[in-house]
A protein has these predicted regions:
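Residue at a conserved register position within TPR or TPR-like alpha-solenoid repeats
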Residues: 73, 113, 151, 187, ...
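N-terminal leader/linker segments that initiate helical-solenoid repeat arrays
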Residues: 15-17, 22-124, 139-142
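Solenoid-like repeat scaffolds
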Residues: 52-58, 91-98, 130-137, 165-173, ...
Length: 275
C-alpha cells in the first residue's frame, strides 16, 4: 500500500509545475516612452554609455504629436479602433521616418494590441521595434525582455530563449535572476531539462546568496526539472527546502513519497505522521 502511494505521489510530481503560474509580462508603457522623449528632443541617448556606441536620431515633434494623439484615444477615450487608425496613418508615412520614430510607432502599436489582448499582433509589433536601428540601447533591451516574456506566455519557447540571448548580448553586467528563471521555464517547456536545470539552479543560488528566499514557483519548477531528469535525491532536497520555507501539507506528503522511493521507509513514516 505504501509503495502504491509513493508511486502516485511521484507521478504527481511530474505535473506539479502546471499549477505554477507564469508571470504575465509587464510591458513598458508607451506613455513612459513619450515622457522620456519630452526630455530628450535633442536626440541624446537615454544613458551615457549609449553615447559612446550609438547615435540615435531625434523623435521629431510632428511624429510625437501623432503618437500622443493615438495614446489619448486609447487611454482617455478608450477608443482602440481610433488609436489604431491614427497609428496606421502614421505608418503610411513611415518612408519619411527615421529608425527611432518607427520604433516608437511600433511600440505604440504593440502597447495598444497588448492591452486589447491581441497578443499575436502585439508580438508582431514589438518584434518590429527591435528591427529598427539605431534606437536607444535601453529601449531595445526593454523591448527584447518584454518579447521574451510574451513569447513564453504564448508558448513560443525557442523565441523566448532567442530574445533573452539578444538581451544578454547587450547587457554589460551579470545575467539577472529573473532572466535565468524565464530561460529555465522556456527550456523546461521545451523538454530541454539539462539546460533548464542549469538556469533554475543558478537563479535559486544567486537569490539565496543575496540572503533572499526563492520564490515558491521557482522551487516548484526546480523540483519538476529534477524529477524529469530522474534525480530523486535532488527532488528530495528541494522538497526539504520547500517544507522548511512554506510548511504546506502537500509538500510534507510529497517529501514522504520521495523518502519511500529512496528506500528510507523510517523517514517516510516519520514524515507521514508529521503531515
Amino acid at each position: 500500500m505504501m509503495r502504491k502511494q509513493t508511486n502516485t505521489l511521484l507521478s504527481a510530481l511530474a505535473f506539479a509545475f502546471a499549477s505554477a503560474t507564469v508571470s504575465v509580462p509587464t510591458m513598458f508603457i508607451a506613455s513612459n516612452a513619450i515622457a522620456q522623449e519630452a526630455e530628450q528632443q535633442d536626440g541624446q541617448e537615454i544613458k551615457a554609455s549609449d553615447k559612446q556606441t550609438r547615435r540615435v536620431p531625434t523623435l521629431r515633434g510632428k511624429v510625437y504629436e501623432q503618437l500622443a494623439r493615438a495614446q489619448t484615444a486609447a487611454d482617455e477615450a478608450g477608443d482602440v479602433e481610433e488609436a489604431i487608425s491614427i497609428l496606421k496613418e502614421v505608418e503610411d508615412k513611415s518612408h519619411s521616418m527615421n529608425a527611432y520614430e518607427k520604433a516608437m510607432m511600433y511600440n505604440f502599436f504593440g502597447f495598444i494590441y497588448y492591452n486589447n489582448e491581441d497578443y499575436a499582433k502585439a508580438l508582431e509589433s514589438f518584434a518590429k521595434v527591435v528591427e529598427q536601428q539605431p534606437i536607444p540601447e535601453k529601449f531595445e533591451m526593454t523591448t527584447l525582455f518584454s518579447l521574451a516574456q510574451l513569447n513564453l506566455m504564448q508558448g513560443n519557447y525557442d523565441d523566448t530563449i532567442t530574445y533573452l540571448e539578444r538581451w544578454e548580448s547587450l547587457n554589460a553586467g551579470p545575467v539577472p535572476v529573473k532572466n535565468k528563471v524565464i530561460k529555465a521555464q522556456a527550456y523546461y517547456q521545451n523538454k530541454q531539462y539539462e539546460q533548464a536545470s542549469t538556469w533554475i539552479s543558478e537563479a535559486v543560488a544567486d537569490h539565496e546568496a543575496e540572503g533572499m528566499i526563492p520564490d515558491e514557483g521557482w522551487l516548484i519548477l526546480q523540483r519538476a526539472i529534477f524529477y524529469e531528469l530522474k534525480q530523486p535525491e535532488k527532488v528530495k532536497d528541494v522538497l526539504i527546502k520547500m517544507v522548511k520555507l512554506f510548511d504546506e501539507p502537500k509538500y510534507w506528503i510529497q517529501l514522504a513519497g520521495m523518502y519511500g522511493e529512496l528506500g528510507e521507509e523510517r523517514k517516510q513514516l516519520a514524515i507521514m505522521e508529521t503531515a
